[in-house]
UniProtKB/Swiss-Prot annotation:
Observed effect of gene inactivation: When exposed to copper, the deletion mutant shows reduced growth under both aerobic and anaerobic photosynthetic conditions. Mutant is extremely sensitive to copper under anaerobic photosynthetic conditions. Mutants lacking this gene are more susceptible to copper than the Cu(+) ATPase copA mutant under microaerobic and anaerobic photosynthetic conditions. Periplasmic copper accumulation in the deletion mutant affects periplasmic and membrane c-type cytochromes.
Domain of life: Bacteria
InterPro entries per UniProt: BlueCu_1, Cu-binding_ET, Cu_oxidase_CS, Cupredoxin
CC per GO annotation: periplasmic space
Protein name: Copper-resistant cuproprotein CopI
Effect seen on changing residue 110 to S: Loss of activity, cannot restore copper tolerance in a deletion mutant
Basic and acidic residues composition-biased segments: 25-42
Signal sequence bounds: 1-23
Originating gene: copI
Length: 165
């Protein structure tokens, strides 16, 4: 009798945990960013680039003063750039490409889920003293941004600009 009740109860609990884990597995960026950060799709600011076709490397240093160096980067339309995001600070930082609107929306999402991990070719989270890399092809002219979206960093002004000519 005990087994007839215990076994279905355990199966229900196991199914609940599996469903919760499955639902959480895709939360890397949440629904607000699914279209803006599709892995191989064009975005308003370009698309993931092929590392073998990178025309240059731009090193961007992230600091605990909540700044990027350089703060403005100019690229040519069609250019594929390898960004090396170097964390010169003692705390974790991010380098996330986007539009002003997408970065603001993502920053709000990050405040709700600060431990969110990025599964996005236009974003990299970098531990203190480490470096990360993004390869991006800028397909459209315009002015775009990069930012650190860890809660408090974006709000403190950790935003840079990419000008595509």
């Amino acid at each position: 009798m005990k087994n007839r009740i215990l076994r279905p109860a355990l199966l229900c609990v196991a199914a609940l945990f599996a469903t919760t884990a499955q639902a959480d597995a895709g939360h890397d960026h949440g629904s607000a960013h699914a279209g803006a950060h599709a892995h191989d799709a064009d975005t308003p600011y370009g698309r993931p680039g092929d590392a073998a076709k990178a025309q240059r490397t731009v090193r961007v240093v992230m600091s605990d003063t909540m700044r990027f160096d350089p703060a403005t980067i100019t690229v040519r339309r069609g250019e594929t750039v390898r960004f090396v995001a170097a964390n010169g600070g003692r705390i974790e930082h991010e380098f996330v490409l986007g539009t002003t609107a997408s970065l603001k929306a993502h920053a709000q999402e990050m405040r709700a889920m600060p431990d969110m991990q990025h599964a996005d070719p236009g974003a990299v989270r970098v531990a203190a003293g480490a470096s990360g890399e993004i390869v991006w092809q800028f397909t459209k002219a315009g002015s775009f941004e990069f930012a650190c979206l860890i809660p408090g960093h974006f709000e403190a002004g950790m935003v840079g600009k990419v000008v595509v000519r």
